[in-house]
């Protein structure tokens, strides 16, 4: 029960941090379109975010398995926060450009590719098995709230104080989430080093698993199709 209580604290802090990150992402879209008036610029932002995320996600599972999950999460979050801090500095000095935002989105996509699998494994290790269903519901609830409210909050704050105000909120939410993870959360580690000599070896094993477990493969293909054609 103690671990579950600590997870609740982690969940709250991570949810607030996720809200800050989502607000920043939406505010950057507003800023870019306001400055350029180009839908193409917004499309390039998405491209810069998703391409690194997709490419790195292919290999990152092996990396996460062979390193401490807490360290991976802390480093990934710190790099993302540093990128936000740089965007804030550029914004405050009036030197921010669309090019800076493209680079920021690439960094954000990269850090997310590392943070998400490490977080998923960490949650499974610190939460009692009988509470995993609760955790799944809590995560879905918070993620949906972020999706619904982050654009509205970002638009309000963007109108009130511009991009710097949203970036400041994002950085404060990072400090809270980072502190909780660093000082309050202990993640039991089981580091796997012996199975794979390279990321490609791990990918090969993954494809072999999907070949044998066709049910899981069909579910993945179905979900991919649904996400590709959301309407």
Identify the residue ranges that each predicted region occupies:
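Juxtamembrane intracellular "pre-TM" segments in multi-pass secondary transporters
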Residues: 1-7, 186-220
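Hydrophobic core of transmembrane alpha-helices in multi-pass small-molecule transporters
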Residues: 15, 96-114, 224
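Cytoplasmic membrane-interface "Motif A"-like loop-to-helix N-cap segments
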Residues: 66-80
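C-terminal ends and interior cores of transmembrane alpha-helices
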Residues: 78-95
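Helix-loop junctions on the cytosolic side of multi-pass membrane transporters
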Residues: 94, 121, 125, 163, ...
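Cytoplasmic helix-loop-helix junction between adjacent transmembrane helices
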Residues: 104-147
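A single, central transmembrane helix in multi-pass transporters
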Residues: 161-168, 208-231
């Amino acid at each position: 029960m103690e671990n579950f209580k600590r997870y609740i604290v982690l969940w709250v802090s991570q949810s607030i941090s996720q809200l800050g990150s989502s607000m920043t992402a939406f505010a950057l879209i507003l800023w870019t379109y306001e400055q350029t008036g180009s839908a193409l610029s917004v499309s390039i932002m998405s491209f810069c975010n998703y391409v690194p995320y997709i490419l790195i996600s292919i290999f990152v599972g092996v990396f996460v398995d062979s390193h401490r999950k807490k360290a991976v999460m802390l480093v990934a979050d710190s790099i993302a926060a540093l990128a936000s801090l740089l965007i804030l500095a550029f914004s405050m000095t009036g030197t921010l450009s669309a090019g800076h935002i493209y680079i920021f989105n690439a960094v954000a996509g990269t850090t997310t590719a590392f943070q998400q699998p490490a977080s998923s494994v960490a949650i499974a290790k610190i939460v009692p098995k009988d509470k995993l269903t609760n955790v799944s519901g809590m995560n879905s609830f918070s993620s949906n709230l972020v999706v619904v409210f982050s654009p509205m909050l970002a638009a309000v704050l963007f109108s009130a104080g511009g991009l710097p105000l949203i970036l400041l909120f994002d950085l404060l939410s990072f400090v809270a989430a980072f502190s909780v993870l660093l000082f309050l959360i202990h993640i039991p580690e089981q580091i796997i080093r012996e199975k794979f000599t390279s990321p490609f070896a791990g990918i090969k094993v993954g494809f072999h698993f999907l070949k044998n477990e066709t049910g899981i493969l069909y579910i993945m293909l179905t979900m991919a199709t649904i996400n590709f054609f959301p309407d």
